[in-house]
């Protein structure tokens, strides 16, 4: 699963940075890879799914993009780490991204591309082993 995420990270980030949209084709590819991964590796704990669902619904109510939610959902379902800790990583990197864009353009952006923050947070979270 991590190889598929690594292979699609750059195209997803480029698409999200250019148009603020993650094309569904990338999420479909990741969905089929995740389905295959889960068929072989099995399902993780169901409490993890419940926590992930609560986080995703909260993000939906905060008007986060659907492509970002699909990507986060696939990552949270296929990895057996703490969803709350991972989302804290995503929040930190999204805030840094927001501050950098604000400093460069000298205006507060109305929206930001979240995919780079998602992938950087995943990489650092997996690398540090929290």
Give residue ranges: language-model regions.
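A membrane-topology feature that recognizes alpha-helical transmembrane segments
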Residues: 1-130
């Amino acid at each position: 699963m991590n190889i598929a995420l690594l292979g699609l990270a750059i195209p997803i980030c480029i698409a999200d940075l250019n148009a603020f949209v993650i094309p569904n084709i990338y999420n479909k590819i990741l969905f089929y890879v995740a389905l295959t991964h889960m068929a072989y590796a099995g399902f993780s704990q169901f409490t993890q799914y419940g926590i992930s669902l609560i986080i995703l619904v909260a993000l939906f109510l905060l008007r986060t993009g659907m492509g970002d939610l699909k990507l986060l959902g696939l990552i949270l379902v296929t990895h057996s780490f703490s969803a709350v800790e991972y989302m804290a990583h995503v929040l930190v990197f999204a805030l840094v991204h927001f501050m950098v864009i604000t400093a460069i353009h000298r205006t507060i952006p109305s929206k930001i591309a979240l995919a780079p923050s998602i992938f950087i947070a995943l990489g650092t979270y997996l690398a540090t082993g929290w």
